[in-house]
Structures are given as C-alpha cells and as structure tokens.
C-alpha cells in the first residue's frame, strides 16, 4: 500500500467539505514529507515576519546590523492591527532585538515596519533569495490603506525556513537557537494547536514534563489564513505548514472555517507522528 497517498487521502477527506483552498507541507525531519499544493503561491500576511527575522540575524552575522542598537518608532511607521507599540506612542526607543521579538511574539505591525526600515526592503528581498527562499518576496511595508499585498511565499519555502531552524542551519547554529527561542514565545498558534490534547501543552498546570511545544508564526489577512512552525514531541520535532486562500468569510475569528479545518489537519498529523514514534510513516 502507498502509505503517503493514504495519508494524503485522509487529509483530502477531512477537507472535502471545506469551502476554501488549503495547501499542506509536513516534514518529519527524517526522510518523509507530505506535500499538498506545496508550490502554490500564497499571500504571506504576517508569516513574512519570520523571513524578516531570518534576514536580521543574517545581517547581524555579517556585522551589518546590531541587536543592541536602539531604533526609534517614527510616525511614518504607524499602522493599525496587531501589536503593542501603538500604546507607547511615536518616539519610543527600543533595541533592535526587542523590536524584532515583538514583531514575532505578538505580531506587532509597527515593530515590523521599524525592522523593515532598519534593514531596507530591497536588502530584505536580496537576503531572502540568498538564504534560498526563491519563491518568497516582501512586496511592501505594512500599510493596509496603501497596499493590497504584503508578501508572497509558498508552503515549501515556509517549511524550509522552519526545517533549517530546527536543524540549526538557518544562518548559524547560534542564530537558529536564538530564533527558535523567539518563535517559541509566539502567541498565536490556534490553527496548529486548537485540537491538541491540552494536557500535552499545559505542563505549568499539570506539573508534568513539557511533552509538546510549538515554535511558530501565523499570519492572517482578508485573502489568507496561514500558520506554520516546529512541533516538538517526545520523539523529536516535525515541521508543519498550513496555508489557506479562496475562502468566502474574510472576518477574522478563531472559529473561522480555515482555522477549524486547519486544526483538524494539524491534529491528524500529530496523531500520525505520535503513532509512528516521530515519523510520518512506519517503514
């Protein structure tokens, strides 16, 4: 029996009634992947911030950026949406590292514009290509009243970023570890974890060892609902990316169909990984 097709068919069956289009990429970081629409292009929404973080650490490694340098929130960088910097006001000064951390963990849009200005949009795109993500582009800073598109990527590119973080090969071992620590603090992972057994995730309440943790970055705009990252299990890590488009409901809420069906697929993959002791398939 073709086990790969069996798993893909199970995912397809789960998505049969979904009124949208979902692409899936899963890598067990051993020798197997699941790929459904892996090379389709998607609006990135805030998932582009993961690529920007990688570029920042690349530039730090070259001495062209400094995590301890202070940068200033300027009026031109204001944008609505997620984040905390709106509460601080124009003129606030933050270290580059703290700004980048806010860009990821609470998906701060103003912090993102600050880092884009710090690095330069053209430099960001050149470095994204240099890092090997050939189908990923940052089109514009975050200004929703001026631009319809933020970025473009594919599930394969996004999965490759997290696979390199997990393996310690994105920029360097030290940079990968630093980025992993930031991704682990990211607040918004409902699509990946909503259907996980909460016992696995809540070691602070249960007092048990942390069995499962997530290092991820999600992104949502009218045109997309995306999530992707590293899932740690007792058997090791795997990478999962779920990207959604062509749905009808543009309102953002946790029970959005893309979130509901994404969570079902994510749980299906988790169960498969646990049943196969860290692999996608028993061979």
Over which residues does each language-model region extend?
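Mid-domain, small-residue-enriched loop/turn segments at the edges of structured enzyme/sensor domains
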Residues: 21, 114-170
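Active-site SXXK
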Residues: 43-71, 240
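Structured C-terminal helix/loop/strand segments within mature extracytoplasmic catalytic/sensor domains
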Residues: 1-14, 18, 33, 169-190, ...
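Conserved catalytic neighborhood of penicillin-recognizing serine enzymes
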Residues: 78-113, 151
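A short glycine/serine-rich beta->alpha loop
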Residues: 36-43, 89, 100, 147-148, ...
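Short, glycine/proline-biased beta-turn/loop segments that scaffold the active-site neighborhood
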Residues: 62-88
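Short, conserved catalytic-motif segment at the N-terminal edge
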Residues: 19-41
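Short glycine/serine- and small hydrophobic-enriched flexible loop segments
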Residues: 54-62, 117, 160-167, 267-274
């Amino acid at each position: 029996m073709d086990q790969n097709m069996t798993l893909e068919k199970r995912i397809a069956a789960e998505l049969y009634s979904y009124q949208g289009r979902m692409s899936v990429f899963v890598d067990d970081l051993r020798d197997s992947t699941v790929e459904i629409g892996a090379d389709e292009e998607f609006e990135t929404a805030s998932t582009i911030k993961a690529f920007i973080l990688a570029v920042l650490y690349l530039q730090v490694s070259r001495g062209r950026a400094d995590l301890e340098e202070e940068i200033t929130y300027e009026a031109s960088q204001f944008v609505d949406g997620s984040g905390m910097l709106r509460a601080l006001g124009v003129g606030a000064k933050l270290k580059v590292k703290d700004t980048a951390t806010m860009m990821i963990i609470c998906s701060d849009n103003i912090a993102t514009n600050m880092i884009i200005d710090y690095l330069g949009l053209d430099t960001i795109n050149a470095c994204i290509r240099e890092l090997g993500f050939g189908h990923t582009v940052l089109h514009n800073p975050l200004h929703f009243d001026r631009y319809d598109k933020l970025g473009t990527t594919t599930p394969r590119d996004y999965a490759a970023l997290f696979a390199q973080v997990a393996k310690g090969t994105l920029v360097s071992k030290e940079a990968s570890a630093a980025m992993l620590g930031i991704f682990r603090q990211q607040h918004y992972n409902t699509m990946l974890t909503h259907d996980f057994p909460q016992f696995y995730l809540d070691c602070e309440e249960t007092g048990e060892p942390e069995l499962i943790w997530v290092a991820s970055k999600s992104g949502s705009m009218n045109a997309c609902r995306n999530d992707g990252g590293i899932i740690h299990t007792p058997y090791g890590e795997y990478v999962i990316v779920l990207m959604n488009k062509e749905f009808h409901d543009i309102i953002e809420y946790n029970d959005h169909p893309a979130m509901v069906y994404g969570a079902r697929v994510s749980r299906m993959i988790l169960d498969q990984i646990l049943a196969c002791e860290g692999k996608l398939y028993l061979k």
